[in-house]
C-alpha cells in the first residue's frame, strides 16, 4: 500500500464519493490510487482547477457533505485559491489536496516549487504538509474532521515522491500506532442555555415591531421560521444565501435585503424596534437597523460571528432549527399584526411591479423577462445557481423561490464564475433533479471551458446566459456609487449558442421577448446539457429598491460628465424609478 492509497482509502472511509480535480505530475501517485479505487470513489476531471474548487464548494453547499478538490503542485494549487476563499467566507466544509515537489527539493527553486502549505495559511483552518507515509492517515482524518467541525477549508500538501512510497511498519515512530485515529465525526447537538433562551424570549415578547433576518444557516428551518413569524407578527427578510429559507409565496417573507432586495424588506429594517437574526452574517450593515434602533437577538452556530454585524443583546449559539424549536414555546403571540400586515401589503405591490417589469415587450429584451420566464418553468425540485453581477439582481428579485427548491451563489466573496461549477456539482450530487445555472456573459466566460465537462460526464445541466456584452454591475457602480462615466466594461460578443454546439451540447438563442417563454420551455425540456443565450438590453439599470439621494446625485453626475449612453440610460432609469427620484 502506498501513501497515496492511505489517503484515498481514508477519504473513502469518510464517505467521500467524488473528487473534483485536474491531473498533473505533482499528484501522479494520487492519480494512480484514484485509478485503482475508481469503483469506490469518482474523479471528475475539470478544465481549470478554479472550477474544481468551486465544484467542491457547491457540492458541499447543496449536500452538507465534505467537498473535496485536487490539484497538482505549483500553478495547479494556486488556481484553487479563489474557490477555496468562496468556501471559507461562506463557511463551507471543503478539503483541498495539493501536490508538492520532491520532499528534499522543496525550497530549492526547482520546477513548480511553490510552498502551497504556506500559501494556504490564510484560507485554511487546517493546513498541513505530509511528512511520510505513516503521517497520512492521521493528517487525513484530522483534516476531514476539522473541515466538517468548523465549516471551513482544510488543506493537505502532499510531496510527490512521498505519494508513491510504500507504507512500512518500520517507518513509524513509537508513538504513532497504526489506526490509532478514526473517521468519526459527531455533529454538534449544542443548544443554548435555558437562561439565554428566556432572556431572548423576553426581548422578543417586549418588541412591538419585530423583524427576522434569515440567512444560509436557516435553510433547514423553514417551518420553524414561519411559526416564529406567525407568533411575533414579524416579516422575514432574507439574505441572498437564505433565498430558499422561506418560499417567496409565504405570507411572512418580504424577500431579499440590500442593493438587490425589496422595498418592503428595507422598510422593515428601517422601522423595526426588535431584530432576530437567524443564521446570517449579511455583510452590508448599512441596510440593517442603525445601532441602538432595535434590540437584537441572534441565533448562530459559530460563536465568533455572534454580534458581528449588529450589537445584539443576546446570542444563542446553536443550530437554527433546534434553537428556534426551543425558543418558540417561550414566546407570546402578538395581537397587534399591523407591522406584518404593512409588510404584506408592501409585498403585494412589490410583486405587481416586478411582474410588470418582467412582462414588458420592449426591445431590446429586458433581463427581467428572462428571469421571470425561467422562474415560472422551474420544477419544484430545481437547484438554481447564480453568478455575481447584475445577474444577481434579476435572480434575487424576479425568480420566486418555491418550497423544495435550492438556491445558492458566492455569497460573501461575491466572486464571478461559480454558477457553472456549482450547477455541475449539484447535478452530480442529485442526478435526477433539475439543475440550472443563471449567469451573465461576463462571469460565464471566465470558466466557460468547463461546459465541456458537463458534456463529457453527460450532466443534463441547463445554463441560462443573460448576454448584455458588458460588465454590468461594475458599469452601474461606476455611475451610481462614484458619479463616473462607465469605462473599461464593454465585452466583445461571444456566440454562446455556437460554443455549446462546439462542446457537444445544444445551444439556443432568444432576443425577442415574445419568444422568450416558448424558447425557454424548449431549452429546459432538452434532455442533455444545453445553453440558452438570452440577448438583453445592456442599459437596464439594476437600481436599489430605494434610491438614496447620494446615489441619485452620483448618477446624475455620471451622465453630466460624459457617459456615452446618457440619453438612453436616463430615459430607462426615469421610467422605472421616478417615484423614488422625486
Language-model features: locations:
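Glycine-rich phosphate/pyrophosphate-binding loop at beta-loop-alpha junctions
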Residues: 7-12, 447-450, 469-472
Amino acid at each position: 500500500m502506498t501513501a497515496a492509497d492511505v489517503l484515498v482509502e481514508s477519504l473513502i472511509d469518510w464517505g467521500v464519493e467524488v473528487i473534483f480535480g485536474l491531473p498533473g505530475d505533482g499528484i501522479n501517485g494520487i492519480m494512480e490510487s484514484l485509478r485503482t479505487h475508481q469503483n469506490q470513489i469518482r474523479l471528475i476531471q475539470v478544465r481549470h482547477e478554479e472550477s474544481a474548487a468551486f465544484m467542491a464548494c457547491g457540492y458541499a453547499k447543496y449536500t452538507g457533505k465534505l467537498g473535496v478538490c485536487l490539484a497538482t503542485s505549483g500553478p495547479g494549487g494556486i488556481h484553487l485559491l479563489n474557490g477555496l476563499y468562496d468556501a471559507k467566507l461562506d463557511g463551507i466544509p471543503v478539503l483541498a489536496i495539493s501536490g508538492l515537489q520532491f520532499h528534499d527539493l522543496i525550497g530549492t527553486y526547482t520546477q513548480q516549487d511553490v510552498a502551497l502549505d504556506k500559501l494556504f495559511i490564510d484560507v485554511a483552518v487546517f493546513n498541513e504538509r505530509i511528512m511520510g507515509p505513516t503521517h497520512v492517515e492521521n493528517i487525513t482524518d484530522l483534516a476531514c474532521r476539522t473541515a466538517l467541525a468548523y465549516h471551513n477549508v482544510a488543506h493537505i500538501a502532499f510531496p510527490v515522491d512521498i505519494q508513491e512510497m510504500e507504507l512500512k511498519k518500520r517507518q513509524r515512530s513509537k508513538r504513532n500506532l497504526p489506526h490509532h485515529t478514526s473517521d468519526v465525526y459527531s455533529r454538534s447537538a449544542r443548544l443554548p442555555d435555558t437562561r439565554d433562551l428566556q432572556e431572548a424570549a423576553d426581548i422578543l415578547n417586549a418588541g412591538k415591531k419585530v423583524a427576522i433576518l434569515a440567512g444560509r444557516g436557516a435553510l433547514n428551518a423553514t417551518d420553524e421560521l414561519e411559526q416564529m413569524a406567525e407568533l411575533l407578527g414579524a416579516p422575514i427578510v432574507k439574505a441572498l444565501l437564505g433565498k430558499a429559507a422561506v418560499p417567496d409565496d409565504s405570507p411572512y417573507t418580504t424577500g431579499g435585503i440590500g442593493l438587490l432586495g425589496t422595498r418592503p424588506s428595507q422598510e422593515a429594517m428601517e422601522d423595526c424596534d426588535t431584530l432576530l437574526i437567524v443564521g446570517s452574517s449579511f455583510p452590508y450593515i448599512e441596510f440593517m437597523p442603525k445601532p441602538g434602533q432595535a434590540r437584537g437577538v441572534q441565533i448562530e452556530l459559530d460563536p465568533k460571528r455572534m454580534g458581528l454585524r449588529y450589537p445584539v443583546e443576546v446570542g444563542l449559539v446553536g443550530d437554527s432549527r433546534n434553537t428556534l424549536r426551543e425558543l418558540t414555546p417561550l414566546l407570546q403571540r402578538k395581537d397587534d399584526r399591523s407591522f406584518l400586515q404593512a409588510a404584506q401589503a408592501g409585498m403585494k405591490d412589490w410583486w405587481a411591479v416586478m411582474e410588470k417589469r418582467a412582462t414588458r415587450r420592449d426591445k431590446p429584451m429586458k433581463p427581467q423577462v428572462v428571469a421571470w420566464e425561467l422562474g415560472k418553468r422551474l420544477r419544484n425540485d430545481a437547484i438554481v445557481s447564480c453568478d455575481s453581477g447584475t445577474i444577481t439582481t434579476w435572480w434575487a428579485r424576479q425568480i420566486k423561490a418555491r418550497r423544495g427548491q435550492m438556491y445558492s451563489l458566492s455569497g460573501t466573496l461575491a466572486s464571478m464564475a461559480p454558477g457553472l461549477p456549482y450547477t455541475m456539482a449539484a447535478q452530480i450530487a442529485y442526478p435526477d433533479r433539475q439543475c440550472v445555472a443563471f449567469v451573465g456573459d461576463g462571469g460565464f466566460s471566465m470558466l466557460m471551458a468547463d461546459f465541456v465537462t458537463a458534456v463529457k460526464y453527460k450532466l443534463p445541466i441547463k445554463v441560462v446566459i443573460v448576454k448584455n456584452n458588458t460588465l454590468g454591475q461594475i458599469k452601474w457602480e461606476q455611475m451610481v456609487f462614484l458619479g463616473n462615466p462607465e469605462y473599461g466594461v464593454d465585452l466583445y460578443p461571444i456566440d454562446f449558442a455556437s460554443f455549446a454546439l462546439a462542446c457537444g451540447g445544444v445551444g439556443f438563442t432568444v432576443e425577442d421577448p415574445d419568444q422568450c417563454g416558448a424558447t425557454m420551455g424548449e431549452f429546459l425540456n432538452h434532455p442533455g446539457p444545453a445553453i440558452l443565450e438570452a440577448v438583453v438590453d445592456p442599459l437596464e439599470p439594476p437600481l436599489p429598491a430605494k434610491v438614496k439621494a447620494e446615489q441619485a446625485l452620483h448618477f446624475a453626475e455620471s451622465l453630466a460628465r460624459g457617459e456615452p449612453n446618457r440619453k438612453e440610460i436616463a430615459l430607462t432609469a426615469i421610467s422605472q424609478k421616478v417615484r423614488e427620484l422625486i
